[in-house]
Each structure stands twice: as C-alpha cells, then as structure tokens.
C-alpha cells in the first residue's frame, strides 16, 4: 500500500466511493475482456492484411490504435477500484487519466474524419477528391495525435493523486475530484477549450456531414447500390457512438466543471449529485472502444472478408482433424488404412489459403 504520512497535517477521512468503485470494476472488466482482443485483432487486420490502402481504413486503423491504448491502461484502473486506493507510483495515475482523455477526444475526431470522408466522396466527389488520398489521411491522423498529445500535458499535470485517511492510515486516491483551487484556476478554461475542439466541433461536423449525405442519398436520382447501404450503416454507427458514448459524458462534464468552478452557483449537495451522474457517464465514454470494432465489421467489407478468410483455414483444419480421428477409430483393415491415409494426406497437403477468401480492393467500395 502506498502511504504518504505527514507530520504537518492530518488528511481528511476518505469519502465512501466503494459503491461506484464496484460498478466501475464490473463495467471496465467487461470492456477490457471484450475491447482488448477486438481492437488488437482490428489493428492486425488493418496493418497486416488490408495494408491500410483506403482513406477510411487509415482512419479506422488509428481509431483502433487509440482504443487499444485505452484498454491496455484498464488493469491500472481495475486494481484501483478493487482496492479502493492507488497502490502504484503517482505518475501512473497521471498517465492513466491522460490516456482516457486522449482516447475520448481522439475517438471523436477519428470518427469525424470518417464521416467527413464519406461526405466528400458522396456530396462533393470531384471538388474534394484531392483531399481523399491515403497520404493526406495519414497527415491528418498525425496532426490529430499531435493535438491530443498537447492536450494530454495539462491532463497529466492535473491528475495528481490526493491523500486521505482510511482505517488510521494515509492512502492515495486517483480519478476522483480535483481541488476547488484547481477548478477555479486553469482547469476550467482548459476543460472548456478541450470540449470545444475535441467534442463540440466534431459533433457538429458529424451531424452536418451525415445529414448532407443522407439527403443526397435520399434523392430520387441517387444511385442505389451496395456502396450506398455500407455508407448509411457507417454513418449511422458513428452517430450512435457519438450520441450514446460521448454526448452524455461531455455534457455532464461541462455542467460539473461550471459548478465546481463556481461559474454557476450551486450547493455542495447539487455538486455531489452531478458528480455521481458523471461517474456513471464516464463508463459510457469508455465503452466506445468496444463499439468501434462493430463499426469496422459491419461497415468495412474488406475487414469482414479478412475475418472470413481467417476462419476458413481454422474450419478446414478442424474438419481434417476430425476425419483423422474417425479413421483411427475404424478397424485397421487394408482398405480402411488406405482410406485413412488418403483423407489425412489431403487435409495436410491441400490447406485452404487464407488469402484466397478475399481480394482487398484499393477503392472505396472495399473499405
């Protein structure tokens, strides 16, 4: 246990956060169990199988990397919520807090870039075609990472663990409340700036671009094709993630920041209630890393075909193994022995080529 005893001042008694810690422990365990393999597989598919040829796959690859980074930090949070105190060095508390903010704002921006790319491809296919190149997409993603890293610096500085007393001992808390002095100082302006650049602008861009695309595709002269259906699924999935994961958390966070900064007068009881809501909404924001892989699967044909290609050799090897076991169970007559050798050799010498199940295309129709 990390104990920071001080002879100068006795810390206050630790608040009872155990009920909300138990909720976070359950939800984040599910997010880790599902999000880690899903995003690791997605990143492997984009980098190794699809080779990130299309513009949308570039954005999806970076989105998967952001989600994977967050899921890798979850064991620190799970240990904290299980023990109800921070047992690690202080810098890991700061790092885990910064990774969450980077993932949330990074996910908002990467989803926005996906939507804007669909807007450029369907509403302005000729005017904006120079922006729809993989090289431009990679430069934009590099700029996004630079932006969220810059905003991570004040987050790291603000996420200092706080000390309190529990059972006669000093313990450290993480991911809880910042001090009133910090809220009234530089934290609130930084929060509002991050909300404007990392959430409000992306939300406005997603709503506008999705609306224009839906309007264009709904016209009587619009081409009805499989590409149209994929685009609609992709945009709807992005809207659902924004409305379900990001809007509730960011709206509650803005209200809580205004209350803590005393921009809006409120009683301490009202602030506690808003904080309780915020602690639930943060779970929705963290759950986006489980929903994003569903966007890849249902919207990206190349991604789906790759997963089918991975399943094919596994199925063939299972069938070959079952055939060999059945042959060994038969009486070892000369005919049965010959049949067994034939079946087994075919299963070994003619495996399914996992690359033959799909042909990744460089066009948008295969994103």
From Swiss-Prot:
Residues 47-54, 117-135, 208-238, 297-367 are cytoplasmic. It is a multi-pass membrane protein. One of its GO terms (molecular function) is G protein-coupled receptor activity. Residues 332-367 are annotated as: Disordered. It is found in: Cell membrane. Disulfide bonds join 93-174. GO terms for biological process: behavioral response to pain. Residues 332-350 have a biased composition (Low complexity). Residues 351-360 have a biased composition (Polar residues). Glycans are attached at residues 4, 170. The chain crosses the membrane at residues 26-46, 55-75, 96-116, 136-156, 187-207, 239-259, 276-296. Keywords: Cell membrane, Disulfide bond, G-protein coupled receptor, Glycoprotein, Membrane, Receptor, Transducer, Transmembrane, Transmembrane helix. One of its GO terms (cellular component) is plasma membrane. Its main location: membrane. Residues 1-25, 76-95, 157-186, 260-275 are extracellular. It holds the Pfam family 7tm_1. Receptor for lysophosphatidic acid (LPA), a mediator of diverse cellular activities. Belongs to the G-protein coupled receptor 1 family. This is Lysophosphatidic acid receptor 5. The lineage of its organism: Eukaryota, Metazoa, Chordata, Craniata, Vertebrata.
């Amino acid at each position: 246990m990390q104990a920071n005893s001080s002879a100068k001042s006795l810390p206050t008694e630790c608040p009872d956060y155990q009920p909300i810690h138990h909720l976070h422990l359950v939800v984040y365990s599910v997010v880790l169990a599902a999000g880690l393999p899903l995003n690791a597989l997605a990143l492997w598919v984009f980098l190794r199988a699809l080779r990130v040829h299309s513009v949308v796959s570039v954005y999806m690859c970076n989105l998967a990397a952001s989600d994977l980074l967050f899921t890798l930090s979850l064991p620190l949070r799970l240990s904290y919520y299980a023990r109800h105190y921070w047992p690690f060095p202080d810098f890991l508390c700061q790092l885990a807090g910064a990774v969450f903010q980077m993932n949330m704002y990074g996910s908002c921006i990467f989803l926005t870039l996906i939507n804007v790319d669909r807007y450029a491809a369907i509403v302005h296919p000729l005017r904006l075609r120079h922006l729809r190149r993989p090289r431009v997409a990679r430069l934009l993603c590099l700029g996004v990472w630079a932006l969220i890293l810059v905003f991570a610096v004040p987050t790291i500085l603000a996420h200092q663990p706080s000390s309190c007393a529990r059972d006669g001992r000093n313990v450290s808390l993480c991911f809880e409340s910042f001090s009133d002095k910090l809220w009234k100082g530089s934290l609130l302006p930084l929060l509002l700036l991050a909300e404007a650049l990392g959430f409000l602008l992306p939300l406005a861009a997603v709503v506008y671009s999705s609306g224009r695309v839906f309007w264009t595709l709904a016209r009587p002269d619009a081409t009805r094709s499989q590409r149209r259906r994929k685009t609609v699924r992709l945009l709807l999935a992005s809207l659902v993630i924004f409305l379900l994961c990001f809007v509730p958390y960011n709206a509650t966070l803005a209200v809580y920041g205004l209350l803590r900064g005393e921009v809006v007068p409120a009683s301490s009881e009202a602030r506690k209630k808003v904080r309780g809501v915020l602690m639930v909404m943060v779970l929705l924001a963290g759950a986006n890393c489980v929903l994003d892989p569903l966007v890849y699967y249902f919207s990206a044909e190349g991604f789906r075909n790759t997963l089918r290609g991975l399943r094919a050799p596994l199925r063939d090897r299972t069938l070959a193994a079952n055939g060999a076991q059945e042959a060994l169970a038969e009486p070892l007559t000369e005919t049965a022995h010959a049949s067994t050798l034939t079946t087994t050799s075919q299963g070994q010498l003619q495996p399914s080529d996992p690359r033959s199940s799909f042909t990744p295309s460089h066009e948008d129709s295969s994103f």
